[in-house]
């Protein structure tokens, strides 16, 4: 899917906060959760997400989703990663201080 089409689909589905992210090789983010849903399209490179002990790698052309409140860890591949991400606030979790 082309990034322009992906961005249109994000907006259609209520993912109003959209940005292109570029993360450096080897970057790691410890387990955390967000107060919003995430949908992302990998444009280049690789990112690995670990949820409940299961790790999955996403590469160019792959789409990943992360519902609000799901704890996960992130690990960027050896060449970094470039992806287009949309965030959709969820009313029940948007103001929950435990979901950061």
Where are these regions (language model features)?
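A short, N-terminal "cap"/entry segment at the start of jelly-roll beta-barrel domains
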Residues: 1-20, 30, 96-100
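Short histidine-centered beta-strand/loop micro-motifs
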Residues: 7, 28-34, 51, 75-76
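Conserved short histidine dyad/triad with adjacent acidic residue
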Residues: 17-34, 68
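Short, conserved beta-strand element in jelly-roll/cupin
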Residues: 22, 33-49
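Short, charged/polar surface micro-motifs in flexible loops or helix N-caps
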Residues: 25, 44-48, 55, 89-92
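Short acidic-glycine-tyrosine-enriched beta hairpin
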Residues: 52-68
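Ligand-binding loop in jelly-roll beta-barrel domains
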Residues: 68-93
């Amino acid at each position: 899917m082309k990034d322009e089409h992906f961005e249109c689909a994000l907006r259609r589905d209520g993912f109003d906060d959209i940005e292109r992210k570029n993360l450096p090789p080897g970057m790691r983010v410890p387990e955390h959760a967000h107060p919003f849903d995430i949908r992302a399209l990998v444009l280049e490179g690789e990112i690995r997400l670990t949820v409940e002990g299961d790790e999955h790698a996403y590469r160019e052309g792959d789409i990943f989703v992360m519902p609000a409140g799901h704890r996960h860890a992130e690990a960027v591949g050896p060449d970094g990663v470039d992806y287009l991400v949309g965030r959709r606030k969820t009313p029940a979790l948007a103001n929950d201080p435990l979901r950061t």
